[in-house]
């Protein structure tokens, strides 16, 4: 789970950066 947290954050960050 701990390893999945950063993975999810990275995906969200990419989406936000792409959307912004």
Swiss-Prot record:
| Domain of life where this protein originates | Eukaryota
Question: Where expressed (tissues)?
Answer: Expressed by the skin glands.
Cellular component terms per the entry's GO annotation: extracellular region
Predominantly, its location class is: secreted
Q: Sorted alphabetically, which keywords does the UniProt record give? A: Amidation, Amphibian defense peptide, Antimicrobial, Secreted
Q: Cite a single GO BP annotation.
A: defense response
Residue(s) carrying Glycine amide: 20
Q: Write out the annotated subcellular location.
A: Secreted
Q: Which residues form a coiled coil?
A: none
Q: In which family does this protein belong, per the annotation?
A: Belongs to the frog skin active peptide (FSAP) family. Phylloseptin subfamily.
- Main function: Has antiprotozoal activity against T.cruzi.
Q: What name does UniProt use for this protein?
A: Phylloseptin-O1
Q: Which organism is it from?
A: Pithecopus oreades
Gene transcribed to yield this protein: psn4
């Amino acid at each position: 789970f701990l390893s999945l947290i950063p993975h999810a954050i990275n995906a969200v960050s990419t989406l936000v950066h792409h959307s912004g």
